[in-house]
Swiss-Prot record:
Keywords: Gas vesicle. Belongs to the gas vesicle GvpC family. Gas vesicles (GV) are hollow, gas filled proteinaceous nanostructures. During planktonic growth they allow positioning of the organism at a favorable depth for light or nutrient acquisition. It is found in: Gas vesicle. Its main location: other. One of its GO terms (cellular component) is gas vesicle. This is 17 kDa gas vesicle protein.
């Protein structure tokens, strides 16, 4: 027959084994949770680095696009100015020829004996 004290000691040892088993299980779960936390943190860090790199690449592409747009716009402005200047010159020449022809028609002169009309001379009828 087992004494009461031995039973009590056996129950205490059993409780200690259960507590020890729970501690071991808890430590394992905490280690697993910590490893998962570290893995998630590493993934987030990698994603943050990738996002930063993509943002830097986008910024470079944006600067390149803006630079190209500015250059194209400047070229278009230069072309427009050249076209405007050429059109103005053509209009001056057409007006000069019109004045000369009108003077010749009014005075009945031919081109060879008509008075020379300077480019900036206003027409006087």
């Amino acid at each position: 027959m087992v004494s009461l004290r031995e039973q009590w000691n056996e129950q205490a040892r059993e409780r200690q084994r259960e507590i020890s088993a729970r501690k071991t299980e808890t430590v394992a779960l905490l280690q697993e949770a910590n490893q998962e936390r570290v893995r998630v943190a590493q993934q987030q860090k990698a994603l943050a680095i990738e996002l930063k790199n993509q943002l830097a690449q986008f910024h470079e592409q944006l600067e390149t696009s803006v630079g190209n747009w500015r250059q194209e716009t400047q070229e278009q402005l230069i072309n427009l100015e050249e076209t405007r200047t050429a059109n103005a010159q053509q209009q001056r020449e057409a007006l000069f020829n019109f004045r000369r022809q009108l003077t010749a028609d009014v005075w009945g002169e031919t081109e060879s004996d008509s008075l020379k009309v300077e480019e900036n001379t206003p027409f006087v009828a």
